[in-house]
Amino acid sequence: MHAASAFTLSGRDLLGIEGLIASEITGLLDLAEEFVELNRQIEKKRTTLRGRTQINLFSEASTRTQSSFEIAGKRLGADVMNMSVGSSSVKKGETLIDTAITLNAMHPDILVVRHHASGAVALLARKVDCCVVNAGDGAHEHPTQALLDALTIRRNKGRIAGLTVAICGDVLHSRVARSNIILLHTLGAKVRLVAPSTLLPAGIESLGVEVFRTMEEGLKDADIVMMLRLQRERMAGSFIPSVKEYFHYFGLDEAKLRHAAPDALVMHPGPMNRGVEIDSAVADGPRSLIREQVEMGVAVRMAVLDTLARKLPNA
């Protein structure tokens, strides 16, 4: 039995960061720390999910998140099945429910779901008897990304409370931003958003963030600079004049990074648009945590699956 095995979540599912209390977040991070060490060993196996079935149901393309959940499940001993559902064939509502009912009849133990519609994962969770993990729903939430970001920050800064984190770029379309804002706020960090007004949701200040319209102001003395991918596939209108102009004002390069704290570190959830929201010199530079974020992703998802496994019958 490992040290954090007594830790549990109040619910059967992980649908979002919203609703989690600070002790649940830190409990997951503490357990993930154990899995970071396990993943660096030659033998990377635990048996928490042996004999259990995990289905990854993704209606949006994803390389890193889906492969990360697959590796996490397999390292815990689960039988993992990947189901890719073309988003054109999954209509919001009826077809999703049909899919849920069909999958439920196969008696899976854990469903990991990504869907292009906000709220779809919570809808599906109400129709099945197994644990459900939200791997990203529309522009709503991406809880495991926020958890892996928090773990990365904590390992490098030693804490989260009291830090100033600047989240920059396409906040409007970003489920990563929303989950991170809620988590960081819950753990006592100061959160700034830096974006053009066209890429900010209305009323975002209600989440307890400061909003800035220039990188120079928003990055001033920030401890962490978190860049967001410009999600051009979700943009029907003209949200930005041009990619070149966007990079000029909001792309992170060495010059803009100098406005942050001298020991500021840089993050990006990936995939990156190099030369759009971040310069390669920064992304690949000594202050970048981007590769470490990917490593932390597997550990965090193992922690989530391990914790939910203890909610399963006969666990």
UniProtKB/Swiss-Prot annotation:
GO cellular component: cytosol
Keyword Membrane part of the UniProt annotation: no
Residues noted as binding carbamoyl phosphate in the record, renumbered to the chain: 64-65, 114, 142, 145, 270-271
Keyword presence, Transferase: yes
Binding site for L-aspartate: 92, 175, 229
Family label: Belongs to the aspartate/ornithine carbamoyltransferase superfamily. ATCase family.
Quaternary data: Heterododecamer (2C3:3R2) of six catalytic PyrB chains organized as two trimers (C3), and six regulatory PyrI chains organized as three dimers (R2).
Protein's name in the database: Aspartate carbamoyltransferase catalytic subunit
